[in-house]
Amino acid sequence: MLANSLIELDRAHLIHPVSSYRGHEALGVRVLKSAKGATVTDASGKQLVDGFAGLWCVNAGYGHDSIVEAAARQMRELPYATAYFDLGSEPAIRLASELAERAPGDLNHVYFTLGGSDAVDSTIRFVRYYWNAKGEPQRDQFISIEQGYHGSSVVGAGLTALPAFHAGFGIPFEWQHKIPSPYPYRNPVGEDGNAIIAASLAALKIKIEEIGPECVAAFYAEPIQGSGGVIVPPKGWMKAIRELCREYGILFVADEVITGFGRTGPLFACTEEDIVPDFMTTAKGLTSGYVPMGAVFMADHVYDVIADGAGASAVGHGYTYSAHPVSAAVALEVLRLYENGLLENGIRAGARLMAGLNSLSDHPLVGEVRGRGMLAAVELVTDKQKKTPLPASAMPARRVFDRAWDNGLIIRAFAQGVLGYAPPLCCTDSDIDAIIERTRRTLDQTLDDPDVRQAMA
């Protein structure tokens, strides 16, 4: 089918996520045709370096025949198996075991979902069940962080703190609370790490006391705030927050949907600070985006409370496609690839990526470069001293994304003029160098725009 026919069919029928429906109708879809390694090809034959791994998820890179073969073998042998009725499949059982073996601390129990949003949703249900089983049903208040992202399901989007996910949906709910982001570049206390940690601890204490310590169920945090603009907290921040939650007896949920599976270097970002959460959510890199799957990791003590609380009764939470054998078979092969060289390559490529992006720091539009491993951001400003963001009237996200695309690069351009990077771990030196060169070209072209020049005057 010709690309223009697909464009019309898309315009008429396919609803795209987090998009202006009328805006998309006017623009039309860009049809992707194929991909290999870190390169994608569109329907016109244009090749682009995927600097964002799809949607932070194709960590292993595109076109691994061994992943395709693992899926095909499982489809031929057992394409579906429910995990209801005490049934199971070998891939799902082995995957749960392999993940538990590699998870921080005593996160020895794994519940499989279809992705990140329903993984977060599942934790909310499990947290509520936990506190009811402990005889503390009043603990029904949840805290997360401004500019955080915890999915786009009804309750998860309420924990998310991005306006686009709230407008028109009647969320967040009254039981969902926020504290300020540790955002070093734009923090009221400045960029000193110790001051930021102290401010966050103070804010969390105030919020807990305001709600009532006996009423707070759980606190949610990403090791790096992804969709909020790749905000990297100072070293020690997450560990300090986790310890405060422990002091108050509040469950701590680490959302590693983006950071998990080598994105920041190790398999899980929590291990960089020896953090053992009560729950950990993952998805994206779990299957490298080849098939849908997410996972909730649950600590022993949480599992025991839930299991003992239910006794002979069923814990009434489940999905038709939980522990899907094909997804599990894919995840097992992806995990093998990570440990057979991709994690190491990602660490090397991440160092090259950060060095390359830091080389752009002298560009007139670059206010800050930040990141860890293969997860990074460049924040654009019109005044470096005042940290003035690009004017909203310039539509920086749309403009920069389109321009990068024309230059053969896919990145995430956030509305506030932040460029997000999350390339596949398989990137070669030439892939990384192309990302940097095409970013610089995109910045130079944007600097030449009359309205941007005027804003900088």
Model-derived features with residue positions:
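Conserved N-terminal phosphate-binding loop of PLP-dependent enzymes in the Aspartate aminotransferase
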Residues: 1-457
